[in-house]
UniProtKB/Swiss-Prot annotation:
Its EC number is 3.1.21.2. This is Probable endonuclease 4. One of its GO terms (biological process) is base-excision repair. It holds the Pfam family AP_endonuc_2. InterPro entries: AP_endonuc_2, AP_endonuc_F2_Zn_BS, Xyl_isomerase-like_sf, Xyl_isomerase-like_TIM-brl. It catalyses: Endonucleolytic cleavage to 5'-phosphooligonucleotide end-products. Belongs to the AP endonuclease 2 family. Zn(2+) 2 binds at E142, D176, H213, E258. SMART domains: AP2Ec (SM00518).
Length: 279
């Protein structure tokens, strides 16, 4: 009945949000990610979506929608920037209509036409504009692998954007483990993962962490290769994910599985849950 209801990748909620892990976080899209324009949400769709969420126990803080891949909030070309901003505001409005409070997005690219700081400033301006147009929804910046001219791969990039946001209660970060590793932050052991997130805390602040994407990496450390792998089968290994499931700093945020093989999602989720049980 509701075609756009769930774009479920396979995910889990960290233990203190729901002790029995019944509540599952959701990776979700509000429209086709490869189109600029979609028809407005109809009221019956909105009503049905909210009813389904209530029926299955999905709370807004456990749903992490992702915006269109076409959007570039740091685009140096005025016409394309305006198009991206309009699309981003539309995504926020859709979230607000559906009762969702988070919107995950890739920050943008300078396209080798402006410097990084100017690109980061445009992204911050774009977020501020969206906040003025749409209430309540939090803009959740996803870190990147640093491929091409993408910004957001250094923790300093994320901090520079956040520093320029007027309402800091409505901005956050989603850390993708594959992107983090590909960007040069080591996650290959529990000790290395602790060091990396200590640096994140110092540069950005753990209080801004609003969600995570859990992926192993096909690329090596610092490769800038955005190629997800199944947990434990890539260059990162299991120790990182054991640490994330057991460390208290990651309580109460959605942890979304974005790995490549749907046939083993259930096994991956069971393994992650076993780390909590064995704590």
């Amino acid at each position: 009945m509701v075609r756009m209801f769930l774009q479920l990748v396979g995910c889990l909620m960290h233990r203190k949000m729901q002790p029995k892990l019944v509540l599952t976080p959701l990776h979700y899209i509000t429209k086709n990610q490869r189109q600029w324009v979609a028809k407005p949400l109809e009221q019956d769709v909105i009503t049905a979506f909210k009813a389904r969420c209530q029926q299955y126990g999905f709370k807004s803080e456990a749903i992490l929608p992702h915006d269109s891949y076409l959007i570039n909030l740091g685009n140096p070309e005025t016409e394309k920037l305006e198009k991206s901003r309009a699309a981003f505001i539309d995504e926020m409005q859709r979230c607000n209509q559906l009762g969702l409070t988070l919107l995950n997005f890739h920050p943008g690219s300078h396209l080798k036409k402006i410097n990084e700081s100017d690109c980061l400033r445009l992204i911050a301006e774009s977020i501020n504009m969206a906040h003025q147009e749409v209430p309540e929804v939090v803009a959740v910046i996803e870190n990147t692998a640093g491929q091409g001219s993408n910004v957001g791969w250094r923790f300093e990039h994320l901090a520079e954007i956040i520093d320029q946001i007027e309402d800091k209660s409505r901005v956050g970060v989603c850390i993708d483990t594959c992107h983090t590793f590909a960007a040069g932050y080591d996650l290959r052991s529990e000790a290395a993962t602790e060091v990396t997130f200590s640096e994140f805390d110092q540069v950005v602040g753990m209080s801004f962490l609003r969600g995570m994407h859990l992926n192993d990496s096909k690329g090596k450390l610092g490769s800038h290769l955005d190629r997800h792998h199944s947990l434990g089968e890539g260059e990162i290994g299991w120790d990182c994910f054991r640490y994330l499931m057991q460390a208290s700093g990651f309580d109460n945020i959605p942890l979304v599985l974005e790995t490549i093989n749907p046939d083993i999602w259930q096994q991956e989720i069971m393994m992650l849950r076993s780390f909590v049980a064995s704590e």
